[in-house]
Amino acid sequence: MNIELKDSSHGPVYAQVRDQIENGIRTGQLASGETLPAPAALARRLSVDQGEIQRAYFELEHAGMVKKESGTDFLGKPKTTYRMK
C-alpha cells in the first residue's frame, strides 16, 4: 500500500496515515494477515516523526483493525509487527 501525506490542512500526520490504512482495509487493498511496515521504516519513508506512525498504529489497534505482535528477529532482538486482522 502506498501512503501519501497531504499538507497540514488535511489533518495531522497520524490521522492521515490512520485514515489511509483504514481505507485500504475497507477496500480490500490490505488483506487479513498482511504486515504493515515497521513504524520506524514508514516514518523514514514519509520524513515524519516515528511517534506519528506509532499513534496511527495504536489507534488502528484499539479500533480492532490491526493486531500488534511481539517477538524477536533472527538475531534475538525484540521485534514488534502489526498485521491486519
Descriptions of predicted regions:
Residues N2, T80-K85:
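Conserved segment of winged-helix/HTH DNA-binding domains
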Residues L36, K68-Y82:
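Short, Lys/Arg-rich nucleic-acid/phosphate-binding segment
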Residues G28, G33, G64, G71-D73:
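Glycine-centered flexibility sites
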Residues V13-Q16, E59, K85:
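Long, contiguous secondary-structure blocks with strong helical propensity
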Residues Q54-Y57, T72-L75, K85:
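Short, structured secondary-structure boundary patches
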Residues T35-K68:
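N-terminal helix-turn-helix
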Residues M1-L36, A41, R45-S47:
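Extreme N-terminal segment that seeds HTH/winged-HTH DNA-binding domains in transcriptional regulators
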